[in-house]
């Protein structure tokens, strides 16, 4: 298991929440900078895959500051719920959503990817961008994603892999 801080006695989940609480004020800038903007491009492409699928309800897991949820509005769902374990990230996300006047469509709440606080078959689509690497138990997180997805619904995961070749390996 990869943990943010190897010398701590806290669980990976607690370490991840603490790390994101700490970096939340700079997260959007750092994410776009360190990914070379690829995060923005991938989110746009991913949401295009969900066009014309009749999606009315969406869940954005590890929503952070809400970038993927905001991008998902392009397919006109009635409701998007974003969950994250970091109160700091949620606070910045709420602020961003309020400034954009989107609080009627996007709702953010604290939530654990492995114990999602929703009934089975609740959402037409469940999305996560650059968050599964932070799941404490990947199998539990993915299983819970599928649990809350309606039959015939969609699960969409965006994630980076570890680069294996020069020069990206050295930069990563």
Per-region residue spans from a language model:
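Conserved alpha-helix/loop element of class I SAM-dependent methyltransferases that forms part
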Residues: 26, 36-56, 71
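Class I SAM-dependent methyltransferase SAM/SAH-binding core
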Residues: 57-115
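A short glycine-rich, Lys/Arg-flanked "PGG" loop and its adjoining helix->strand segment in the class I
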Residues: 139-151
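Short catalytic micro-motifs in class I SAM-dependent methyltransferases
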Residues: 130-131
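N-terminal auxiliary segments of SAM/dcSAM-dependent transferases
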Residues: 1-17
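Hydrophobic beta-strand segment of the Class I
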Residues: 27, 126-127
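Conserved class I S-adenosyl-L-methionine
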Residues: 154-172
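A short acidic, Gly/Pro-enriched loop at the edge of an enzyme's catalytic core
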Residues: 114-125
């Amino acid at each position: 298991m990869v943990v943010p801080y190897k010398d701590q006695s806290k669980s990976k989940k607690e370490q991840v929440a603490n790390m994101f609480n700490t970096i939340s004020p700079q997260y959007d800038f750092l994410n776009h900078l360190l990914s070379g903007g690829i995060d923005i491009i991938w989110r746009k492409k991913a949401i295009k895959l969900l066009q014309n699928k009749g999606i009315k309800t969406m869940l954005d897991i590890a929503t952070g500051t809400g970038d993927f949820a905001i991008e998902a509005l392009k397919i006109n769902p009635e409701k998007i719920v974003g969950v994250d374990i970091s109160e700091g990230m949620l606070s910045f996300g709420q602020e961003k959503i309020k400034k954009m006047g989107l609080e009627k469509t996007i709702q953010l709440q604290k939530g654990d990817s492995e114990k999602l606080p929703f009934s089975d078959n609740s959402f037409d689509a469940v999305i996560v961008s650059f968050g599964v690497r932070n799941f404490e138990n990947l199998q539990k997180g993915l299983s819970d994603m599928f649990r809350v997805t309606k039959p015939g619904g969609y699960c969409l995961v965006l994630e980076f892999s570890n680069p294996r070749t020069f020069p990206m390996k050295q930069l990563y």
